[in-house]
Amino acid sequence: KVPFSQIKGFFDDDLNHALEVFKKDCQKSQRYEELKNVCQKAQHTNDGAMFFVSNFQAYKLYDNNSNDEGMITGYYEPLLYGSLKKTQRYKYPVYKIPKDLVLSNVNSLQGYKNIGKKVGKKIVPYDTRASIEKNPNNKNLEAIAYVDDKIDLFFLQVQGSGKIQLDTGEILNVGYAGQNGREYKSIGRYFIDNEIISKEDISVQAIKEALLKNPSKIDDILNINESYVFFRVADQGATGALNTVLT
C-alpha cells in the first residue's frame, strides 16, 4: 500500500473530470455488488480528489522478481486524415466488413476464428492482409473512407477504433466491425528480433520512424501481421468493456 501523495502527478491531474467519467461508468458497473456502495457515494460529490482518496487504496506493483519497474500498455484513439472520396492524397481505404465474408464452423476454418469466404463449393479461410492490399478493386470490399497514411491505417486496425478528420472538416468516428480471421502478429517483435529497436525503446512512434527509414520494406513488414480489421461508422468515440465512452 502507498499513499496517493507518492503517485507522481496524481494531484496534478483533472480528478474532477475523472470523477465525472467514473459516474458515467457507474451507470453500468453499479450492478456489481462490490461497486454499488462507492457508485452511490460518487453521485453526492463533485470533489474528485477527496472522493478517490477517501474511497480507494493505492498499491505499488512489483513483478515476480520484486522489480518495481515495468511496462504497462494503454489504449489511445488514433486521429487520421481522410476523405469520403478517393483522391491522390487520400488513397488508403478503411474497409467495411466484406460482402463475401462468412462465419462457419466447418473444419477448413479451424484456427481461423470460423471466418472465411466461399470459393466455388468450398469455404476457405479469408484473405490475408497482403492479399487484401494487393486487390484494391475487389468488388466485395467497400470503403467507409480513404486516409492519407498507410502506417496510421495499420495502427488504427491495431487499436480497433479511432477518428478520421475529413477534408470537409467533419470528424468521422469509426469502430471495430470484424476481422479476417487471421492471427494477429506484432510487427514490434520483428524490430526487436532484428535488433532494429531495443525492447526498452519499442513504441508506436519508434516503429513508425523505423518504417519511414525503410520505405521499400513497409509493405513486407506490415504484412507480417496477416490480421486485417474492418470498420463501421460509430455514433461516438471508442467504448470499453462497460460500453461507455473511453476518455
Predicted regions and their residues:
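Conserved helix-loop functional segments at active or binding sites
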Residues: 237
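Secretory/export targeting leaders with adjacent low-complexity proregions
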Residues: 2-234, 242
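Hydrophobic alpha-helical bundle architecture
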Residues: 241-247
